């Protein structure tokens, strides 16, 4: 069947973890014989930051690794939904989409026969419910929530009539053990700074132990402020900046262990909803400290 997905970006995973899971989903559906069309905004901030820092080469690399990921980039003002959704049997709109797009697709669904689902993989329903209430899901057939807590909130607050749990998982085509690579260091951690949502946790569970145990350690990620980079350097931890997600299996293979350092909102308000990183590490057979 023809499936249409609207998301922030599949081309860029710069500070954008949703791309990890969705790339795998698109690949899986395509290889099962479905036709998948992906739409992402031309001005997606993740992609803009990626290109500004690293140029176009990473985008070509993503297409090589994920040949089925070939999104159509659109401008919201000129997006023709009749054309975009022609022949669709299923339409999925990801939560990192503009409320205007969510509402327009919902209005289009009112006069169409496809199934329409809203996909939520973020903590805003707990930490910023006012923002989530802006999404008009009146004509949506249901919500795909990445954990039971989120699913229950949609139902309790009557944001949606139906909601289902759909946990994220690693793409085992890309995330697999690389037995031919020998470890070069003790610890690797792949993750972004986190908008001050896990500053204390990073010091307690990553930076401090690496310093106190004298571990050879490397960190990949973006948006690390100067004080964070200074703390890493003082602890003897090598900071290497952004790492394309499809290269993470290689980084995992070159280390003996990694750690899971969740953001505070997930620990405090979203029990049972780990981010995708632990699954990616375990899929690569890397020991994981939680």
Locations of regions flagged by a protein language model:
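Conserved catalytic-core segment of nucleotide-activated headgroup transferases in glycan assembly
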Residues: 171-257, 265, 277-278
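Histidine-centered beta-alpha loop that forms part of the nucleotide-sugar donor binding/catalytic region
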Residues: 8, 96, 119-123, 167-168, ...
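Extended catalytic core of nucleotide-activated donor transferases of GT-like folds
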Residues: 9, 15, 23-27, 37-154
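A short, glycine- and acidic-residue-rich donor-binding loop in the catalytic cores
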Residues: 268-280
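Carbohydrate-associated surface elements
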Residues: 149, 166-169
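Short hydrophobic beta-strand element within catalytic cores of glycosyltransferases
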Residues: 280-290
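Acidic donor-binding loop of glycosyltransferase active sites
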Residues: 89, 253-270, 286-287
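Short amphipathic alpha-helix
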Residues: 19-29, 204-205
